[in-house]
Amino acid sequence: MQTRRIAATGRAAAHLAGTFALALLASAPARAADFDAERMAPESDWTVIVSPYIWAASLKGDASLAGFDTDVDVPFKDTLDHLDLALMGNIELTNGQWGVYFDGQYVRTSQDEELLSHEIGLDIKMTTLAVGAFYQIYEQELGGNTAFGKPRTLSIEPTIGLRWTKLEADVSVAGASASKSADWTDPFVGLRLNADLSERWNLVAEADVGGFDVGSKLSVNAQAYLGYRTEMFGQPTILRAGYRLLYQDYESDDFTGTNKFRWDVNQHGPVIGFSMLF
């Protein structure tokens, strides 16, 4: 067996820092004297929540392809050096009792290496798409209202859904090229928690487990965010910062027909972004 290191997943971090700084500046009306909670209260029972974000994920684990065992140990700064494109976001539709959501990440990296006087090009694409639904089974009022004019609460919501993952690799050398890919879909079940810590601050956390040998052997997703309610461009907005982990253990026959493709990798790192309510 031969062991090597690979790189795979977010130049966007700098843009994100700038975006977050602009968000803070745009939230100047967040001072108590200027913030109109009644105006911020939703006029409809249904709310659409749009949440762009950046996940500065590092990768740690093992992978196998064509009889080669690969040690996956990629800090985010290495990914950033080879990053071409990163798109990440979440959209949720809820009436407060139940709702649906869509979450997606697409990351593309590229790099060139020298091997035996030949230049080898490696392009890697990773796509993760999740769709799910949730239902609120518990809600406890905590007293007072949020900055958006709604009662402060603690709520718990079971969730169920599907998560699709696709890995693509394009290799080029001496004018020749080859492309290989693998994809799988995992069902998952989990819990979401939302706690209004104060008028402006809130904490959200979510954890789910899936795979069950339907797609991967096992997948675990966990994330938690501290949020601050404010206003951006006239819309109620929550600035968020937190941490996320996604572990996947997937195995299938690879393109050789005699070896296994294995992806036993943990992605983890800080997340920063915002949620705008409509």
Predicted regions span which residues?
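Short glycine/proline- and aromatic-enriched beta-strand/turn motifs that initiate or cap beta-hairpins
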Residues: A33-V100
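Residues that define the transmembrane beta-barrel architecture of outer-membrane proteins
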Residues: S44-W46, L83-L87, K125-L129, L154, ...
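Membrane-embedded beta-strand positions of outer-membrane beta-barrel proteins
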Residues: V50-P52, I91, F102, A133, ...
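Transmembrane beta-strands of outer-membrane beta-barrel pores
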Residues: I54-S58, G67, N95-Q97, G104-S110, ...
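Outer-membrane beta-barrel translocator domains and adjoining extracellular loop/strand segments
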Residues: G61-F68, D112-H118, N145-T146, E168-S177, ...
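Gram-negative (and chloroplast) outer-membrane scaffold detector with strong preference
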Residues: G99-E113, S117-A176, W184-G190, A195-L197, ...
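Outer-membrane beta-barrel "beta-signal"
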Residues: A130-A133, T230, V265-F278
